[in-house]
Design a protein with these regions (language model features):
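Short alpha-helical segment of the dimerization/phosphotransfer core of two-component systems
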Residues: 86-91
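Conserved catalytic submotifs in the C-terminal HATPase_c
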Residues: 112-117, 134, 139-149
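Conserved micro-motifs of the catalytic ATP-binding
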Residues: 106-111, 150-153
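Conserved glycine-rich
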Residues: 242-243
Length: 266
């Protein structure tokens, strides 16, 4: 019996250590679960809040049209159908953004990297926004240190991040202004800067521009309602590539967003 007690005494510290380790792991998992629940609750709240109005608009105007279709003029019908279309477009865009946000925050989120010409990728993103820039008479200036800058990236994800930043630059820019896009290669990084002459961001709002669901201005310079997830998604994508994104701004003067990507593979 004495021998058994000695053996028991020997294993007690090991057992205590295992229990403590298990407790810490359980606490960590509990914190992760609580964070996930909080995030999901926030998403659900935003879904309800942001979709309630446009869905209500679609229902109301559809009901009006169905009840009085015979009395509708072509002009009135066209106006009401446009309102329905705008509400549906916003709803679909919002759901798409929520889907992207959920994807980049998933534990299974991964990149499909390939060796690409980054200069060409940035140029293709700029081309996609030329029509929008033209509609607001905004000039797009490009300054690339080289036409051939090769990086190992996920093409679709980086395109998404760049598109978000450039879209915001155009959205918050006034008409007859300029947006500058520069790409500069250094020894270990590639720096992309997108600078606009728009409405700018206040010192109070600037530290929170990458926060989830944070909207600096409810309406942009072109009166488009914002969701507040685009830059948060872009930040996740850039950081997944081991990069950094930052913002500087002067209210009523404009903003400058800088994306730094490593030359090394991710």
């Amino acid at each position: 019996m004495v021998k058994k007690e000695k053996n028991s005494d020997k294993y007690i510290p090991e057992l205590e250590e295992k229990i403590i380790d298990l407790s810490l792991k359980l606490k960590s998992k509990s914190n992760e679960l609580n964070a996930a629940i909080e995030t999901n609750s926030k998403i659900l709240g935003k879904l309800t809040h942001n979709l309630k109005n446009p869905v209500g608009v679609i229902f109301s105007f559809s009901e009006m049209i169905l009840e009085d279709l015979e009395d509708y003029s072509a002009e009135k019908l066209g106006k009401h159908m446009q309102i329905i279309k705008n509400s549906a477009t916003f709803s679909l865009a919002f759901l798409d953004t929520i889907s992207k946000y959920t994807r980049v925050n998933s534990p299974n989120y991964s990149l499909k990297t390939e060796r690409i010409n980054y200069s060409e990728l940035v140029n293709s993103v700029i081309i996609d926004f030329k029509v929008k820039a033209f509609e607001k008479n905004i000039g797009l200036e490009m300054n690339f240190s080289s036409k051939e800058i090769f990086l190992t990236l996920d093409r679709d994800e980086i395109t998404q991040a760049l598109s978000t930043v450039l879209n915001n630059a155009l959205r918050y820019s006034n008409e007859n202004s300029t947006v500058n896009i520069s790409v500069e290669e250094t020894k270990n990084t590639v720096e992309t800067a997108i600078t606009d002459q728009g409405i700018g961001i206040s010192d109070a709002d600037l530290p929170r521009v990458f926060d989830e669901f944070y909207v600096v201005n409810t309406y942009s310079a072109d009166k488009q309602k914002c969701i507040g997830l685009g830059l948060a998604i872009a930040k996740k994508i850039i950081e997944k590539h081991k990069g950094k994104i930052s913002a500087n701004s002067i209210l009523e003067k404009g903003s400058r967003f800088k994306i730094i990507l490593p030359v090394i593979s991710v």
